[in-house]
From Swiss-Prot:
Keyword Signal: yes
Source species, domain of life: Bacteria
Keyword Signal: yes
InterPro entries referenced in this protein's UniProt entry, alphabetically: DUF1007 (IPR010412), UCP008159_ABC (IPR016537)
Protein name (database record): Uncharacterized protein HI_1249
Cleaved signal peptide residues: 1-18
Keywords: Signal
Organism lineage string: Bacteria, Pseudomonadati, Pseudomonadota, Gammaproteobacteria, Pasteurellales
Originating species: Haemophilus influenzae (strain ATCC 51907 / DSM 11121 / KW20 / Rd)
């Protein structure tokens, strides 16, 4: 069976192309255990063109094992890119994730496909008197990964001593114009473009 799909191709070669030509809506929930941050539960919903390519490949999979291999291949590439998610603590130390995602799978919602998975931290992080910042983005900005609204981040699991918020990026007009000028055939040699458009989750605890 042909295991190539648009999404798999994107996650294999994110560094090749530029500007947002595909779109992923993100939902994120912090996972809290014993007043420690242990990971994040994520849902990524692809746009219809990207979804159609993946759904086609899933339909070509004749067995459960073939479908699982497709999913495992995509998740493997997401993991190899650090889940496209960058987490820092109050001292600006980068926090590592476990290379083994949990509870992952696929949902089809109408014409759109959604990946869901839990991202465990390599080591739980104490919440008390700490601040965390999380950004999820494609460094090349070929794929725009965004939270459609503030409600796309669920902070309900946070304890009373913690507050969470979603911060929108403040992108310079020249940067926006530069990104808009790039097409699918152009390479973006500067991997700093994506972070400029990335929203930021802040978790601050007393």
């Amino acid at each position: 069976m042909k295991t190539y799909s648009l999404l798999l191709g994107l996650f294999i070669s994110f560094g090749v192309l530029a500007h947002p030509h595909a779109f992923i809506d993100i939902q994120t929930t912090p996972i809290i255990e014993n007043n420690q941050l242990t990971g994040f539960s994520m849902k990524w919903t692809l746009d219809e063109p990207s979804s159609s390519a993946v759904i086609y490949d899933m339909k070509q999979a004749r067995t459960k094992a073939e479908k699982q291999k497709l999913l495992d291949d995509v998740m493997g590439n997401i993991v190899s890119e650090h889940y496209f998610s960058y987490l820092y603590d109050a001292q600006n130390n980068k926090i590592k994730y476990s290379p083994r995602p949990k509870n992952y799978g696929i949902n089809v919602q109408g014409l759109q496909l959604q990946y869901y998975f839990d991202v465990p931290l390599a080591h739980p992080q104490k919440l008390e008197k700490n601040t965390f910042s999380l950004q999820t983005y494609d460094p090349t900005y070929y794929v725009a990964m965004t939270y459609a609204s503030k409600s796309a981040v669920d902070f309900s699991a946070l304890s009373k001593n913690c507050q969470g918020k979603l911060i929108e990026p403040n992108v310079d007009e020249k940067i926006q114009a530069y990104a808009s000028s790039l097409d699918k055939s152009q390479k973006n040699e500067d991997d700093s473009l994506g972070v400029m458009f990335a929203q930021k989750i802040i978790i601050q605890c007393e």
